[in-house]
Amino acid sequence: MNGNTDGFKKELIITLKCFFGFEETLKEELKELGYPDAKILNRAVQIKGKWKDIYYLNLHSRCSISILVEIASFKIKTENDLYQEAAKMKWSSYFDVNKTFAVKGAIYSDVFKNTHYPYLLVKDAIVDHFRDVTGDRPDIEIKRPQVLIDLYVSNNQVTISVNTSGNPLFQRGYRIDAGEAPINEVVAASLIRMSGWDRKTTLMDPFCGSGTLLIEGALLATGIPSNIERQHYAFKNFKNFDEELWNSTYNSALRIVRSLPCKILGSDISDEMVLKSRRNLRGFSFGRFVEISAKPFNEATKPEGPVFILSNPPYGQRLELDEELYEEFGSWLKHEIKDGTACIISSSEEGLKSIGLKHSKKVKVYNGNLDCSFRIYSLFEGKRKEAIA
């Protein structure tokens, strides 16, 4: 590996962060990617590995928000202990003084009266180290730092990590246009995996918006990494960045050429949303095979044979809640879809009740900061007899 690697251990403790409710889903994804020994944490999954795994997972993990590498772990009793321990670290072995940085994370400790103060202490320790070693200091950049330090304090236990992803991994790089209330890309990928879709049955989203669920479904079905269009990764700013290894990892992903094994259909009542979906699909080889129509859900072309419906219907907080829409959608599912599965995410409890169908699975999840419910319904010829009035 090129550069100075003294700062990092040979065996890395790697933490992959995810949204609440998707820990088991991320663990299953890691097993499929060749990492069977993952440990579930709160909103995260942890494994051990090497830098080749960091490069591979940043590119291939669809369900991760960010990927951290632990660089220090210690206990503290006072606020000053945090500064003293952070000041002992050889920060200049991780990144150069000309790189911008920021310190973020989570603080759950009574040691600190002000939860912002720990970040300032670590920031000062980093700046003081560079000033002592180089005579210069790195600049702090809060919004788009080149190096992002993750600080996690739980009671007296401190863990300091580097965020190898930088910007969250739901910033895929493929979205040209977003809808009014878009579903997060990592949430979309996680829902698809949680839903149990077999990647062969026709996938349909009758409220497709800007097409995120359809695109993530097509990426999964074709095996193309969701982050293949993403350019920025924070690990490129570390001293030990191995460009040759990264290029090899990336080029291997580019060689994945698999035709779409199923039909993927989308519709939306908004002409503008349909146009946005088509724009977002343009950059992919499968883009022309994904069928998008500007129609309300009950006028969309129903596919022959089994269908897997995955959708994020309009709901409150960002869009006006329309219980009548949910009731009509439930009636359409009940009477028009004779063979299939419907998977619905919504933050509207009343809207979901209005669907009027018994769910086979219910999971609490988050779409960004929105508290949502994800429900799975089995649809078949006799479903109307089981409907809830």
Give the location of each predicted region:
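Conserved S-adenosyl-L-methionine
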Residues: 183-302, 323
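C-terminal edge-of-domain segments
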Residues: 149-165, 375, 384
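Short, charged/polar, Gly/Pro-enriched secondary-structure boundary elements
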Residues: 52-59, 167-170, 383-385
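SAM-dependent Rossmann-like transferase core, predominantly class I methyltransferases
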Residues: 160-194
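Non-catalytic nucleic-acid substrate-recognition regions in nucleic-acid-modifying enzymes
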Residues: 2-145, 389
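C-terminal catalytic and target-recognition region of SAM-dependent MTase-like enzymes
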Residues: 295-389
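A short, flexible beta-alpha/helix-coil linker loop
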Residues: 108-111, 168, 314-318
